[in-house]
Regions:
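Short glycine-enriched, charge-decorated loop/helix-capping segments at active-site entrances
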Residues: 222-228, 299-303, 368
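Generic structural signal for well-ordered alpha-helices
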Residues: 99, 137, 165-172, 196, ...
Length: 483
């Protein structure tokens, strides 16, 4: 059966259409040396430098693919500069911090790139009890984390939806000293509309599901057995999640599995599809790369991308989907993460453990890790590093709890109004962290940064309110103040 490209369709074969992607790549090859076309495409993006006063059209997946294929040094430098400037216009210098929490590595799937695959007899299988989850969360709160992304393999017997829901309730219930987890994002396998409704009722933050690869034939090869082997079921999951009432969804591909140009086009088409059908694009886009792990050698995948191209992909996602939050994890090294922050990344993990029960172990356990962690710094080290670069480490979760989600969040973000909330909230939550958890030198330079950043809050009333909230945090012990 032949399929035609239709971004408004609910059929994965139509909104991620193979023929359209191949035609897109051919178009990009035909025009990659047309420097004037490339600059004209970049010019279309410039209204996004002023989101409060101008509403520029998004460039298409074809136009973005031309830019990706372009090898002209001047164009590539212009791409990075524009991406930096657009990120500043939408998100400023704030960097949201989070941590993953692995609940269970039981899995019935056979993904060839993941050590949790069912045939791996070497990995110890483990599932956290609710008491163990409490201990993990207390350890995370004692670091200073306020936002978690929970992860679990797909296993109806060991990890049913009831286990995920109970775990979310446990996480939200824990208030240790001044600690609290205020937003729980969920990264679990594609499921039904009814189960998405249950996650919504349990106060999910963002539902995250990595596509892994948009190449259907490659997807089938990489997922030979298990529920995840159904490409359409997996690819159409975000539509079911939004039908189930989940406002915020997060996309991502695992770069290195298939051609990065194919994946990039598919990722942008998925974002276009969500906009076309639901009026709301992805709340976040993640950019993981295949990394070593037990039973996994990334060198067997011959589509790896060098750091320079990886940075260009990040920059082009920022230009093409300017409103989205962009996430990079501790899969990447400090050096790569530092450069990625310039070109579009707005969220990073810190102090992460990618093993089940990893936060309460004295020594870092490697035998249950999903992937090797490249950036092994503590959360305080990451916060200190961000401050040194004049980034504002943010632990804010205010939008989610104030109802600024889905189309409401997007209207604030696309108009630039979100800056009136996010910047002050970032400063208040940073003050919480510096008061409760930071090392003395981190605290000292962090409060100096807050003083400098307060002067950048343009609205005089909001600047005064922000200063008062910070004072209440530091001197009165108040917590969870937000705008």
């Amino acid at each position: 059966m032949g399929y035609s490209y239709n971004p408004k369709s609910l059929c994965a074969d139509e909104f991620i259409n193979d023929e359209e992607i191949l035609e897109t790549l051919a178009f990009a090859d035909a025009h990659k040396n047309d420097v004037q076309m490339c600059y004209d495409i970049l010019e279309k993006c410039k209204p996004h430098l002023h989101p409060a006063s101008e509403h520029g059209a998004m460039i298409t997946h074809r136009e973005a693919s031309v830019l990706l294929a372009c090898e002209d040094a001047g164009v590539n430098e212009a791409i990075k500069q524009l991406a930096h400037d657009i990120k500043q216009a939408y998100y400023g210098n704030r960097i949201v911090l989070f941590a993953p929490l692995y609940l269970s590595n039981y899995c019935v799937n056979s993904c060839l790139y993941c050590p949790y695959h069912a045939k791996n007899r070497e990995i110890p299988r483990r599932k956290l009890t609710q008491d163990e989850i409490r201990a993990e969360v207390i350890a995370l709160q004692d670091m200073g984390h306020k936002r978690l992304a929970i992860e679990a393999g797909e296993d109806p017997k060991h990890n049913p939806i009831e286990y995920i829901l109970e775990s979310m309730d446990t996480i939200y219930s824990i208030k240790h000293k001044n600690g609290a987890i205020r937003r729980v994002n969920v990264n679990i396998a594609a499921t039904t509309v009814d189960e998405y409704r249950m996650l919504k009722k349990a106060e999910i933050g963002t539902y995250i599901l990595f596509q892994e690869t948009y190449n259907k034939e490659g997807y089938k090869r990489l997922h030979p057995t298990g529920p995840k082997s159904d490409y359409n079921w997996h690819t159409e999951a975000m539509d079911r999640a939004m039908e189930g009432g989940i406002d915020d969804v997060g996309l991502g591909v695992l770069f290195g599995l298939e051609s990065y140009r194919y994946e990039f086009a598919g990722l942008i088409m998925h974002a276009e599809h969500l906009e076309a059908v639901h009026g709301v694009g992805p709340h976040t886009i993640s950019v993981p790369r295949v990394k070593p792990a037990m039973d996994i050698d990334p060198d067997v995948f011959d589509n790896g991308i060098p750091d320079e191209m990886f940075e260009k992909i990040i920059a082009l996602i920022r230009i093409t989907v300017p409103y989205t939050g962009m996430i990079i994890s501790t899969r990447e090294s400090q050096t790569v993460r530092e450069r990625a922050l310039r070109y579009g990344i707005s969220q990073i993990s810190g102090g992460s453990r990618t093993s089940v029960g990893g936060y309460t172990e004295q020594a870092r356990p490697h035998d249950t890790e999903q992937f090797d962690v490249s950036d092994q710094r503590t959360l305080d080290d990451v916060v200190s590093w961000l401050i040194d670069q004049e980034h504002v480490p943010s632990f804010c979760t205010a939008c989610y709890r104030a109802g600024r989600t889905g189309d409401r969040f997007m209207s604030f973000c696309k108009s630039g109004q979100i800056l009136n909330y996010c910047h002050p909230n970032a400063l208040v939550t940073l003050a919480e962290y510096l008061t409760d958890y930071a090392k003395p030198d981190t605290s000292q330079k962090g409060f100096a940064l807050i003083e400098r950043e307060l002067q950048k809050v343009e609205d005089e009333k909001r600047r005064r309110q922000c200063a008062e909230a910070i004072s209440a945090v530091v001197h009165k012990g108040e917590r969870d103040l937000r705008f």
